A protein has these predicted regions:
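His/Met- and acidic-residue-enriched segments that coordinate or traffic transition-metal cofactors
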Residues: 2-6, 12-171
């Protein structure tokens, strides 16, 4: 039994580096332009969904959270616009078809408690991903202003994540 247990432990331990690489790949290195594209799309989607929460959500906490996200991500988009412009990077000004189909369209069909549940889940997942990417950009951006922008945006994203987790637990 001991040799079997030892072998099993060796197999599990030898797979941990691969698992760590997979997690690290989620926040893979991006060019500054790719980060601007990601951040702008994220801001526009979050602001749009936040506004939608005002009419489609059933609980007041979800509506309030959506209103906060709409305001915060609109402000963040404007800050990103200024930084991108100074860095001579292109700034998307509309949600692209891919993000519309993946993020906006599914919510158009939901109302009430179903909207609330799906919104909370997506906000936890989305903010978890965004935080990893922003941390990477805050450390590795080529442009100093973009690096600073990413670092300054992190506390707001982290608050959004914690609030979304609270909404998810309440459902």
């Amino acid at each position: 039994m001991k040799p079997v247990l030892t072998a099993a432990c060796c197999i599990v331990l030898s797979s941990l580096p691969a698992f760590a690489k997979d997690k690290a790949a989620e926040a893979k290195a991006m060019s500054d332009q790719q980060f601007v594209d990601f951040a702008a799309q994220t801001d526009m989607v979050e602001a749009n969904l936040g506004q939608l929460a005002g009419s489609a959500a059933s609980s007041q906490p979800v509506k309030d959270y959506g209103q906060m996200l709409a305001a915060d991500h609109t402000k963040d988009y404007n800050q990103l616009y200024d930084v991108a412009h100074q860095a001579n990077l292109n700034m998307p000004n509309a949600i692209d078809a891919e993000h519309n189909k993946a993020m906006i369209d599914p919510f158009q069909k939901l109302k009430g408690a179903a909207f609330d549940r799906h919104y909370a889940q997506e906000m936890v997942a989305g903010h978890t991903k965004a935080i990893a990417i922003y941390k990477k950009e805050a450390a590795d951006a080529q442009n100093a202003a973009l690096k600073s922008y990413a670092a300054q945006a992190l506390p707001v994203l982290e608050k959004h994540l914690e609030d979304a987790k609270g909404l998810e637990k309440a459902k």
